[in-house]
Amino acid sequence: MDATAIILAAGEGTRMRSNHCKVSHKILGKPMVQWIVDATIKAGCSRVVVVIGSHADEMRALIDGAYANSATKVECVEQTERLGTGHAVKVALEACGITQGPVVVLNGDLPLITADTVAKFAQTVATGELACTVMTMTPPDPFGYGRIKLGADGQIERIIEQKDCTPEQAATLLECNAGCYAFDGAQLAAHINEIGNDNAQSEYYLPDMLEILKGHGQAVSIFHCDDYRDGLGVNSRIQLAQLTAIARDRINEHWMAEGVTFIDPTQAWIGPDAVIGRDTVVWPQTHLIGHVTVGEECQLGPNSRLTDTTVGSGCTIDETIAIEAVIENGVDCGPRAYLRPGTHMLDGSKAGTHVEIKKSTIGEGSKVPHLSYIGDTTMGSGVNVGAGSITCNYDGVHKHKTVIGKDAFIGSDTMMVAPAQIGDGALVAAGSVITEPVPADALGLGRARQVNIEGWAADYRRRLHENDEV
């Protein structure tokens, strides 16, 4: 679809009481503005223009960082003077040279709008019969929204703001303005300069385009959302939480319909870019943030948070934090495991209780069951790491690597001082400090020999008591 989406994201958002741009606040781990950009891309818009103003550098980072490699052109245009929504659209048109085709103008704080809604909305002006359509909705509580009054011909007669509604209008006019507009690009470009600023705020308001277009004999109509939630916006932290709950419910219901079990759908927070395989069970307080893929027949949670992580099938992820990790099939993580960026758990491996792994590959069937830190390590298959063992990978300036061969056994409370090399089938005695390579099938022993002194403890206690009597 050769349509342009203009997303208005220049506002201050003062009611959020934040040091950050309103539309940068996250819903299920994703900034609001990215929800809307994604919806326009999925709807088939060929170009997306985000109008920024307040916190411009922050907004550029959010957009450029996420869409630098997008097949759809996504760009930021700065509105240096915030002179209203009409002015913002004019800035976008002039900067991008938009003169034709459907132009969809969306507020940047509508994270629930769907691609299907955007596509249908843009299509209303694609034939040229309508110069503009206004997105409307019928929320359960219309208080605070501008009300739509239609004429006998089905066109918009006027939009009556809440403060201007009579009691009768408030009771009978239940269709509300969602604040989004679709324009015939040629008509918009031809008449955008006719918007005036003769109002209390001396701003240029985009809704004034309705009367301007009608004055030129152009048809203006409405597009009613099938789901009123598509038109809900965020102006406060309370509304942010409310829309987060709606987004959570939508996503969880989708995955339940796809064959995923949720023990308590109100206590699982699945991001919009996550994918979950069938017959996986999601336990309470599970968070999937960013691009997360989970295979089939997994147990996720409770109390787990996965960010930009891939999980295979048949895995157990129990009270685990994983960030930018790859977890293959049949892997057991937790409880209370921490997989940091660069972790790669191969098939059948294990990261157990209070285990931290960073930038390491854990080989097929290898186990790190208890109280260990493994960093900058390549571990072969069939390795067992005893409780309390760590790789000492940092010398105060540089990180160094550890290599543990297949079928090696690392005894409990072992410190492997990197760069360290443990050969295939080697055994490292418990309590060792390993500073030299251990050859294949060798025993590595790096501790002092135990010495027993007969009677020493009894003599020690006797001397303590004598000192107490002095």
Name what the model sees in each region:
Residues 4, 31-123, 127, 465-466:
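Conserved N-terminal catalytic core of the sugar/cofactor nucleotidyltransferase
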Residues 9, 52, 107, 136-137:
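Short beta-strand/turn micro-motifs composed of small residues
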Residues 25, 111, 174, 181, ...:
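Residues that recognize and position ribonucleotide moieties
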Residues 261-445, 450-451:
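Structural signal for interior beta-strand "rungs" in well-ordered beta-sheet cores
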Residues 57, 113-200:
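Conserved core of the sugar-phosphate nucleotidyltransferase
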Residues 1-18:
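N-terminal nucleotide-binding beta1-loop-alpha1 segment
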Residues 157-249, 253:
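Catalytic-core segments of class I nucleotidyltransferases/pyrophosphorylases
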